[in-house]
Amino acid sequence: MSEKTVKYEVKGPLAVLTLNRPNKLNAINTKMMADINKAMNQAEEDIKIRAIVLQAEGKSFSAGFDLDDEVWEAKGEGELRATLEQDFDLIMRFWDSPKPTVSAVQGYCLGGGMEMALACDLTVAAENALFGEPEVSIASGVVALLLPWFTGPKLAKELLLTGDTKVPAQRIYEMGLINRVVAL
């Protein structure tokens, strides 16, 4: 039986997408990417849906891209480039959506998970949320393109050059990267 990596619910005018790999801190694998795209298509095509909410099951929003996923075992530059383009396209789905997107973040929100959350029109984080970009120690991706749009170059570089994975929600709010910090 195939794992249901994304739950899709309609709540009035909202489509609620729930990342559903809590045992892996909602790390984004190939299956989850396909499931997110399918859910986004469904929400965007439904004329009754006015906005899309992205949230996660469990104690963390997302630990980022699942490095145990076989897609990261690229055999050459071409395959790695294709993987990075697929990751970019996934994140930009939220940025480019014709419907407003809102991310609700709790716990760890790292790497690709942080990029996906920040690509939403609005981001609300629980007080326990911790943000970071650990992949900057190996490579830089979408985040290097997105961060300067949200915050000035100095603050973007602070996140990109440190690779800190435990930046509290309040600091991220002060940097202008999220809209609200709320009690859990």
Please describe what each predicted stretch is.
Residues A56-R93:
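Glycine- (often His-adjacent) and acidic-residue-rich active-site loop
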Residues N23, A27, A34, G78-F88, ...:
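Residues at secondary-structure transition points
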